[in-house]
């Protein structure tokens, strides 16, 4: 396949989203919509230009978190609004240039490869059951002959179900020669990229239609369409993992973000959320658990466990209502209702119900270090920083405020006190 330049249009405000967030930064599976257009474009080209305008600094800053090898230009929206105005002033590196939209997060590189057709313009089209609401594309003898907007279409033209999908490939020479000829003599006073199609037809150029998959070329203009697109994207992610051998219980209830990795003989149960750069290796994530930006290897989590960013679990059991954050646990059992944050716990250690690492003093976070074969009784608080050596027993109800040496018993508990007959005296005094 010959090299080509790619321009991605991402300048619009997206007013139908009804949001202060720029349209292309609304997220699907944890990443901005624009991320996906760029990701797929980079599979085809090393000359990527993203056209911005609305909140361009915010969009640029967000996208630069993911990509460093693309170009950004700011559209002269005041003088040259519209899709045609967006590509003005760009000089593509290669002889062909593909123009994509930043609000098509379902686009895939293998579909874009199909634009490799010998023509002045290759225009993506949809074959629909009903093209109501779309501009119609008139095709004769395999060539595009006309584009007509629905409001301008004749009765016969309205019967046509071939519609414009909104992505084009141009010969760069034609594009650069004809962009200066565009005008804004229309109701919106904008410069339209579709006018280049009319110019090419009038010049007798070859314009080829490319029938594309409607799902892949779905544009997102509202939050309803955003939700619809995310459902499709989620299904794609989960099917790829299941094909690779991952078991998923009721996959429609599972949410997996872009960037998550799942390897080996892993089981993901219903209601699970895997977020950020979570990595699951040979592990069982049980019902309604959340794993975010953490590594879980040869372990089980949940049900209703929460593994927060920076955790690393190896050969570990995390039970119901246990939360970890920045916790390195190796060969640990924490079965019930505990918070383990900013800690390192070694193999053979059992964490009793209600254990808390008190890691924050109101200003700074502090570490709790627990060694091997430590038994932590229920309702224990570790007031960090503390270091618990190997083979230690922590009595239930203890508040640990200092280091504990190997082999010791640590116990902080008030002496029990009983008062004979107190119940009867206490309540009888209230009955009058």
Curated annotation (Swiss-Prot):
Gene Ontology MF annotations: glucosamine-1-phosphate N-acetyltransferase activity; magnesium ion binding; UDP-N-acetylglucosamine diphosphorylase activity
Subcellular compartments: Cytoplasm
Keywords recorded for this protein, A-Z: Acyltransferase, Cell shape, Cell wall biogenesis/degradation, Cytoplasm, Magnesium, Metal-binding, Multifunctional enzyme, Nucleotidyltransferase, Peptidoglycan synthesis, Repeat, Transferase
Cleavable signal peptide: none
One Pfam family linked to the record: Hexapep
Binding site for UDP-N-acetyl-alpha-D-glucosamine: 9-12, 23, 75, 82-83, 135, 149, 164, 221, 308, 325, 339, 350
Catalytic residue list: 336 (proton acceptor)
Listed InterPro entries: Bifunctional_GlmU (IPR005882), GlmU-like (IPR050065), Hexapep (IPR001451), MobA-like_NTP_Trfase (IPR025877), Nucleotide-diphossugar_trans (IPR029044), Trimer_LpxA-like_sf (IPR011004)
Cofactor(s) required, per the database record: Mg(2+)
Statement: the UniProt record of this protein carries the keyword Nucleotidyltransferase: yes
A GO biological process held by the record: lipid A biosynthetic process
Catalytic activity, EC: 2.7.7.23, 2.3.1.157
Lineage: superkingdom: Bacteria
Region listing for Pyrophosphorylase, in residue ranges: 1-223
Region: Linker, residue numbers: 224-244
HAMAP family named among the record's database cross-references: GlmU
The protein's assembly and partners: Homotrimer.
Family affiliation: In the N-terminal section; belongs to the N-acetylglucosamine-1-phosphate uridyltransferase family. In the C-terminal section; belongs to the transferase hexapeptide repeat family.
Name of this protein: Bifunctional protein GlmU
UniProt source species: Aliarcobacter butzleri (strain RM4018)
